[in-house]
């Protein structure tokens, strides 16, 4: 529900049905998201899951170069901006482009709709803000957290989230425990898992 209120396409797919002539027709898996029409009114739209990614379907496959399609396939993000129609506002402008993994659809975010931060976790971005504005991923190192840890990572604009996202390269969320189901794990196996 939080994604819908923020104007994003939710990641959770649900079975969708529609009543036609008194019968329920199965639409498959999909999600619901708010979209602004040409008049500026907000409407709820149904997004069903596509069998193949939207960038491989006409007319979008003609819009992207082979290199851009390869980048969308591997990373899920274009890595640059593209002049195209924004799906939420309906206007043609420079947009950040990402692939919504759950529905296989393209999501766009107009460049002028996002105010980029000058600091990430208290670390000044500096001249890299222009690279971030152009859609590239930037590396930020030596970020000092309040608990004393020092982390480094990559920041980029994510059209799915509608914001700048930071990926911690140190990955503090991955913890290798000493035991699994009560069985002690050797130091060699712990090193291989890390």
Which residues are covered by each model-predicted region?
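Gram-negative host-targeted secretion-system effectors, predominantly Type III and Type IV
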Residues: 1-194
């Amino acid at each position: 529900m939080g994604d819908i209120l923020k104007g994003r396409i939710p990641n959770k797919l649900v079975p969708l049905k529609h009543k036609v002539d008194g019968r329920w027709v199965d639409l498959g898996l999909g999600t619901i998201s708010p979209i602004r029409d040409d008049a500026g009114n907000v409407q709820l739209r149904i997004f069903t899951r596509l069998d193949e990614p939207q960038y491989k379907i006409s007319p979008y496959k003609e819009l992207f170069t082979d290199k851009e399609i390869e980048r969308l396939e591997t990373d899920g993000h274009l890595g640059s901006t593209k002049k195209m129609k924004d799906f939420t506002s309906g206007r043609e402008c420079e947009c950040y482009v990402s692939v919504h993994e759950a529905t296989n659809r393209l999501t766009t975010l107009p460049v002028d709709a996002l105010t980029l931060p000058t600091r990430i976790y208290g670390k000044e971005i500096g001249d890299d803000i222009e690279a971030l504005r152009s859609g590239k991923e930037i590396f930020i190192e030596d970020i000092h957290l309040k608990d004393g840890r020092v982390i480094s990572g990559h920041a980029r604009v994510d059209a799915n989230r509608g914001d700048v996202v930071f990926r911690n390269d140190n990955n503090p969320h991955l913890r290798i425990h000493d035991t699994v189901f009560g069985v002690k794990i050797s130091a060699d196996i712990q090193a291989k898992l890390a």
